[in-house]
Design a protein with these regions (language model features):
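Bacterial Sec-dependent N-terminal signal peptides
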Residues: 1-22
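Extracellular, repeat-based ectodomains that mediate carbohydrate processing or recognition
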Residues: 21-431
């Protein structure tokens, strides 16, 4: 099935105003009663190794389901695994990644649960091992599993140890040569027993691991505040600020680099996205409400020449509040950001979903951030409910080809579940 979409196309990695086609490739029908299959913090939902693309989702029975295809093919091989997930909790998503030898790694079903992890029995296989420990350390209370692939084929794995408002960031590393995990940090970012970091991260083309986060002091989303930053140039062992100043670990509220000051009760969302420009400068996408406004807007926080800057995109008109606990039904998605070019002349694409645009897959494009002029277009002519954008990071890094995971899902406020029929999971191939 194909849908016509509007997109500001990529040409030689620069944006230009043009129309293009998006090809929507159906995969399989899946659970859609909440947003567990379509939350922004799935790292990853889609991933490509050489010419094989993998996908993961929960089916209507709550089974961890895997799929693969050859790139540009329309037929998927789908396998329902023996593993289950609590599909009634939108936190309990699936994350996948493929290591440098082609083994698929999977982690799923966490919201203060013992770590669930397995990997494929052979390269490019959809058959998984039994459930395995990673390191056996700090694996009893895990949330938000995320994989990141390093240029040498090794993997980094992040998760929260603890609960909302009182948790620590754990970092593990997988070595493809030894095929073993080691724990690099039990407490990379220390909440000091009174708050925790809600992070987003990325790896640039040189292998620098960038991480940014907001602090939260309670389960109430309204307690989110500030945007902080750290990076590692040695595979996650040592950490520094954007200036090169070394961190004394663990990072905490007192020594963390402040990228942007954002007060509590600003409708600041947690767990969004970040990327880097062609020079490795970090770009962080989020949304919050400025002090003189009632309307939360998308913002870009970025660093150029050792100076932090912030852009208010300003195109939204509808107010809303994030106060409360649990996964909420929110009129906009958390954003996904991609950048080309360098510094103040970089071009940005921000992918999102907004009820103001009938909940379609949309993109805001700025060709020159020094001018801060944005053009907003819809990529689909169909709505996607409470979907949030995730994409195939490795395909983008390797081939600058953009594939989005898309499913029309519903989310009831306060961790509720909708009476929804299964919906088709699609890969939206942006040409």
């Amino acid at each position: 099935m194909k849908y016509l979409c509007l997109l500001l196309c990529f040409l030689s990695f620069e944006f230009s105003s043009a129309q293009a086609q998006c090809k929507t490739v159906p995969v399989s029908k899946a659970w859609a009663g909440n947003s567990v299959n379509a939350v922004v913090f799935r790292k990853n939902s889609l991933v490509t190794y050489k010419n094989v693309q993998f996908i993961a989702f929960y089916n209507q029975k709550g089974k961890l389901t895997l799929g693969k295809r050859k790139l540009n093919a329309s037929k998927w091989e789908i396998v329902e695994t023996a593993f289950n997930g609590n599909i009634h909790d939108a936190h309990n998503c699936i994350s996948i990644m493929v290591d440098g030898d082609g083994f698929l790694h999977v982690s799923w079903d966490h919201h203060g649960n013992p770590l669930n992890y397995a990997h494929s029995v052979a390269p490019l296989s959809l058959q998984l091992t039994d459930k395995l420990p990673m390191t056996g350390l700090n694996e009893t209370n895990a949330t938000y599993p995320e994989f990141y692939k390093m240029p040498n084929g090794n993997l980094i794995f992040l998760y929260r140890d603890g609960r909302s408002g009182k948790g620590n960031l754990v970092m593990n590393r997988y070595d493809v040569k030894s095929k073993a995990w080691t724990q690099l940090h039990t407490n990379l970012i220390d909440g000091e027993g009174r708050q925790n970091a809600y992070w987003q991260a990325c790896v640039d083309k040189k292998g620098t691991f960038n991480i940014s986060w907001v602090w939260r002091g309670s389960p109430d989303v309204a307690s989110n505040h500030d945007m902080l930053f750290a990076r590692s140039t040695d595979g996650g062992i040592s950490w520094e600020k954007s200036t090169g100043e070394k961190y004394t670990l663990p990072i905490n509220e007192a020594n963390a680099e402040l990228a942007c000051s954002i007060p509590r009760n600003s409708e600041l969302i947690n767990q969004t996205s970040m990327t880097t420009d062609d020079s490795g400068n970090p770009f962080i996408a989020s949304y919050w409400r400025s002090a003189n406004s009632t309307v939360p807007q998308y913002h870009i926080v970025y660093n150029v020449d050792n100076k932090w800057k912030e852009l208010d995109l300003g195109f939204r008109t509808t107010p809303f509040s994030l106060s409360g606990v649990g996964t909420k039904r929110i009129p906009i998605s958390r954003p996904q950001v991609l950048v080309s070019g360098k510094g103040d002349k970089a071009s940005i694409r921000l992918f999102f979903r907004d009820s103001e645009r009938n909940d379609k897959v949309s993109v805001a494009v700025c060709n020159n951030i020094a001018q801060n002029q944005w053009k907003v277009s819809d990529l689909t002519n169909f709505g996607v409910g409470s979907w949030e954008p995730t994409y195939d990071t490795e395909l983008w890094k390797d081939k600058k080809s953009l594939h989005l995971f898309v499913e029309n899902v519903q989310q009831v406020d306060g961790e509720g579940v909708a009476e929804a029929q299964p919906e088709m999971v699609n890969v939206l191939e942006v040409k």
